[in-house]
Curated annotation (Swiss-Prot):
Catalytic activity: RNA(n) + a ribonucleoside 5'-triphosphate = RNA(n+1) + diphosphate
Gene that encodes it: rpoZ
UniProt-listed Gene3D superfamilies: 3.90.940.10
GO BP terms: DNA-templated transcription
The protein's name: DNA-directed RNA polymerase subunit omega
Source species: Rhodopseudomonas palustris (strain BisB5)
Alphabetical keyword list: DNA-directed RNA polymerase, Nucleotidyltransferase, Transcription, Transferase
Length: 130
């Protein structure tokens, strides 16, 4: 196989974009010292990785898993969550069904304006000349 084309690999990996991602990841693995599964034949790492995929010496599913693992910053650990979380204010009290509803007070616009009139504006501080 003198030249590797996408058509040689497309039956192993359905999506061309995925093929490029997997081949690039495998080429980076080869650059970092991973063992080759075929002879190099004086080819560069991207060509070797495409040849490995075309000849099925590496599994695209394994490459996909390694790629996802290399891109993960945080590994999610499934831990069981508690069913109920106690409220901060009622540590010793029992939780009732009525406590879960939040009561909101409705305020009219006039009541809001009256409340705002009572607020004093912040004092202006004199500007300092330098």
């Amino acid at each position: 196989m003198a030249r590797v084309t996408v058509e040689d690999c497309i039956d192993k990996v359905d999506n061309r974009f995925d093929l490029v991602l997997l081949a690039a990841h495998r080429a980076r693995m080869i650059s970092s010292g991973s063992q080759l599964t075929i002879d190099r034949d004086n080819d560069k790492n991207p060509v070797v990785s495409l040849r490995e995929i075309a000849e099925q010496t590496v599994s695209p599913e394994d490459l996909r898993e390694e790629l996802v693992h290399s891109l993960q910053k945080f590994v999610e650990v499934d831990e069981p969550e508690q069913d109920t979380v106690p409220l901060i204010g009622s540590v010793g009290a029992s939780v009732d069904a009525d406590d879960t509803e939040v009561a909101l007070e409705r305020m009219t616009e006039e009541e809001l304006l009256k409340g705002l009139e009572g607020l004093a504006p912040p004092e202006e501080q004199p500007e300092e000349d330098e």
